[in-house]
């Protein structure tokens, strides 16, 4: 069974330490994945102000965020401008590409996207994407062919802005099948490959799921009859939970699960009927995420 492995790289620390760790692990298992990089300023520490929201505070406590992410991530860009990841760590990003992994754009400024994208019009969104697109193109020596928005924060304006780039596909939402997004009654050409499985921070500490049984729980969610797309984070599975993720990958292999870049799924799975992207709340995540409108059977 082939399953898409999407690796989101949100921060300077995740790029510097998590990406090389994950590349080494995947090479040892003869697997490749899709890495989506944030390449602009690392201002993730500015999310600390969200601690004033009870749901976000509970999530931070439930996942033991300080030990999970590290204080350098939690404070980065809070009191001073964060480093531009793509300029400081271009060799790390390029090394993932040279190792045969698919490399796509996550964001220019990950924090700014999550915090302000809803207030941006299409041109402002295009400008944000263009900054990241241009820097990543320079690093890779060619334009990136795919993208994935931070935090599954997407909108019709985002989809229209992305349609102005030569992306083969985007992965901007949660769902259950590959589809063409509908905007203002029209089907866009760029397909969406949605994430079908929950992330570590959405399930650990809930419903009896702990680090001790997390791998078994996640493996139980894979369905050979359906599209399977898993998102991990370089900051989590690539650093704090690296050993646990290595055990997960080896257990998945023993069950016949082979992780592949998302682009492979375009060839393996037919695109279903077109669908709109809508905002929904899902268990374990604070606030809304973008979801495939007809995805009634999502695993959360």
Describe each model-derived feature in a short phrase:
Residues 192-206:
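Positively charged, amphipathic and often flexible ligand-engagement surfaces
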Residues 200, 232-235:
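Active-site clefts of carbohydrate-active enzymes
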Residues 1-146, 151-191, 209-230, 237-300:
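Catalytic alpha-helical scaffold of carbohydrate-active enzymes acting on polysaccharides/glycoconjugates
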């Amino acid at each position: 069974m082939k399953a898409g492995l999407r690796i989101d790289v949100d921060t300077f620390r995740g790029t510097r330490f998590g990406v090389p760790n994950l590349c080494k692990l995947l090479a040892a298992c003869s697997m490749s994945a899709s890495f989506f990089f944030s390449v602009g300023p690392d201002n993730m520490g500015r999310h600390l102000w969200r601690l004033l929201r009870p749901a976000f505070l509970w999530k931070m406590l439930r996942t033991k965020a300080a030990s999970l992410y590290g204080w350098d991530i939690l404070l980065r860009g809070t009191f001073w401008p964060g480093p531009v990841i793509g300029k400081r760590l271009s060799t790390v990003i390029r090394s993932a590409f040279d190792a045969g992994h698919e490399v796509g754009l996550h964001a220019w400024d990950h924090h700014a996207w999550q915090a302000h994208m809803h207030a941006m019009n299409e041109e402002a969104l295009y400008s944000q994407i263009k900054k990241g697109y241009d820097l990543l193109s320079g690093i890779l020596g060619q334009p990136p062919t795919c993208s994935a928005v931070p935090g599954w924060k997407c909108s019709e304006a985002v989809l229209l802005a992305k349609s102005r780039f030569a992306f083969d596909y985007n992965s901007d939402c949660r769902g259950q099948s590959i589809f063409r997004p509908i905007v203002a009654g029209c089907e866009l050409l760029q397909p969406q490959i949605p994430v079908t499985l929950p992330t570590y921070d959405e399930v650990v500490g809930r419903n009896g799921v702990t680090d001790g049984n997390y791998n078994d729980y996640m493996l139980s969610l894979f369905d050979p009859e359906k599209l399977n797309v898993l998102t991990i984070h370089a900051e989590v599975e690539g650093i704090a939970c690296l050993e646990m993720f290595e055990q997960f990958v080896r257990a998945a292999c023993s069950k016949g699960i082979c992780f592949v870049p998302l682009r492979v799924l375009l060839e393996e799975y037919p695109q279903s009927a077109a669908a709109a992207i809508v905002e929904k709340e899902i268990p374990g995540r604070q606030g809304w995420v973008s979801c495939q409108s007809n995805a009634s059977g999502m695993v959360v």
